[in-house]
Amino acid sequence: MSQTNYIPSTPNKSTPPSELSSTPIDENDIGLLVSLNQEISSNIHVKIKIEENITIGRSKTCNIVVPELIVSGKHCIITRADAIENGNTNYGLLMIQDQSTNGTFINGKLIGKGKSRLLKNGDKLCLGKSTKEIDISFLYKSNYSNQLLLSSSTNNLNNSGTAQYIWERKDIKDDILKDYDFIKELGSGNFSVVYEGVNKNTGKRVAIKHLNLSKINTHTPKFKSQLNREIEILKFINHENVVEIYDIFYTKDQQLFFILELANGGELYNKIGFNEPLLNENQSKFIFKQILNAVSYLHSKGIAHRDLKPENILFDSYGDDYLKIKITDFGLARFIHEGELAKTLCGSPLYVAPEVILSLHHKNKYGTNSSSSSQSPTKDINSVGYGKSCDAWSLGAILYIVLCGTPPFDDDDDEEMSTPQLFEKIVSGNYRVEKLEKSLISSSAADLVKGLLTVDPDKRLTVEQALNHPWITEINNNSNNNNNNINNNSSNINIIKKSPLKTVNTNNNNNNCKLSSPIKNSSKLKRNLSNEPLNNNISNNNNTQTSFTGSLLNQLQLNEGELLKKRKTFLSNNDQKENINPVINNPFLKSSQ
């Protein structure tokens, strides 16, 4: 900024916050620094582009000149903290760097020379320490304040004269607010809320996951000791395909906060089509190998994810051609009581391994303290090995959905299926193998899916075996380099927006590809929940297990015929998926994060 503005010397006369609403705002500005002294002739219009800065000080070389002795030659520097990149919304956030001798203050707190602090809507900026003789202070009014987490009350100013934010009423602790500001809520689940935040000192965008453990765990010393061990393990996770954990806060009242790397390219969930996939086989392979590498790394650290699903697989950046992924929410299930896990199954059952369902059934039948190995149908639900095999199953379900565009355990003839019926299909391995075989994918890809969707965990492919599967090892070597743009892997790999048939890489002369459309399963899923064995006409190379839904209904507190939350699907009224007609009912479940 080349223009220099002079602000005259003024006595101390403050303007009440209630009178600030009449101050005109230029919509082309980022915001206004509204003078809190009536003798200052004009406010400071913050017109600033990305990577530009505004200097405020006594020197004539500054953009904003304040000729007061308390103000240093170059007192502070204002930069944008909300650069618009990768599709991010502009939130009107500013970063203030203190360059002064007498101090720059935000809401009465000294920034410190050479240090920076975030300035958000409603904050008070003061040049030098306020005294009775002089007070050079401003109230920042962002033109984008309606996009921040302001409270819904008519008076957005608290007793200190600064904006009141939603998290101030949500038990978000001072330890977190010392270093981070919360911008907006990204999503919520049964036990957690995820916010987009920003580091006050650096302006770096982060994701903040808030887990309220007081609702789901005990206060025993044993649990707290285990929690500390788990936190220490998670802090040392470092992999290019795993969302980085910057910091973890744990409060005395069992509030857990994860400060996470922000992957803002959207979820894998948003690139799954309806009945026909949006990703071709080479793109699916490129993505799935990254997922396998990430899960393999976590397993090597003794961490089982336990909640793998497309919603927990994020793209690093926006764009159809940028397919680098990062998985998130790993290890969080280790902080959740097993009893609560049973409740979550009803909200996100599509990726649950058979042994998880059987384990819950076993504990309901024999009791949680049962140690009879002869009666137990599964491994210990809390063991690491158990979690690893469950992850492999979930990966198989994810790969099936990505390749086929529909979930493996679903009914072609009905949009609605009860949770017990879905569980019955899962534990019997009764997935739609004909859909997989008739889809336009290679036999090698289908073989990998079948190996992962094997009911017996001892016969199921491990993640390491999946990494060594021919479908993965034959991946183009170019996909292993550091340039993650998928266009470098093949000249013919483009995301197919909508097509009746899957398009594959034309450079791959695979004789196993079939051009026939998928055949619908003519057998309608039975609606009554009996104890009869399932129909075994379809063979998936799995060990079929008998029905147990009668007692499982009691374990999960479900009634016979109860539907999967009315099949909430991938498309809600307020949530439109990428490139998919919103009037179509997608047969997936929209599970909570």
UniProtKB/Swiss-Prot annotation:
The keyword Kinase appears for this protein: yes
Catalytic site positions: D307 (proton acceptor)
Stored SMART domains: FHA, S_TKc
Keywords: ATP-binding, Kinase, Nucleotide-binding, Serine/threonine-protein kinase, Transferase
Catalytic activity: L-seryl-[protein] + ATP = O-phospho-L-seryl-[protein] + ADP + H(+); L-threonyl-[protein] + ATP = O-phospho-L-threonyl-[protein] + ADP + H(+)
Gene Ontology CC annotations of this record: cytoplasm; nuclear envelope; nucleolus; nucleus
GO molecular function per UniProt: ATP binding; calcium-dependent protein serine/threonine kinase activity; calcium/calmodulin-dependent protein kinase activity; calmodulin binding; protein serine kinase activity; protein serine/threonine kinase activity
Region of interest: Disordered: 1-24
Binding site for ATP: L186, G187, S188, G189, N190, F191, S192, V193, V194, K209
Superkingdom of this protein's organism: Eukaryota
The EC number(s) this enzyme carries: 2.7.11.1
Domain FHA: start-end pairs: 54-111
Domain Protein kinase: 180-472
GO biological process: DNA damage response; intracellular signal transduction
Family matches, as InterPro entries: FHA_dom, Kinase-like_dom_sf, Prot_kinase_dom, Protein_kinase_ATP_BS, Ser/Thr_kinase_AS, SMAD_FHA_dom_sf
PANTHER family tied to this protein: OVARIAN-SPECIFIC SERINE/THREONINE-PROTEIN KINASE LOK-RELATED (PTHR44167), SERINE_THREONINE-PROTEIN KINASE CHK2 (PTHR44167:SF24)
Family: Belongs to the protein kinase superfamily. CAMK Ser/Thr protein kinase family. CHK2 subfamily.
Protein name: Probable serine/threonine-protein kinase fhkA
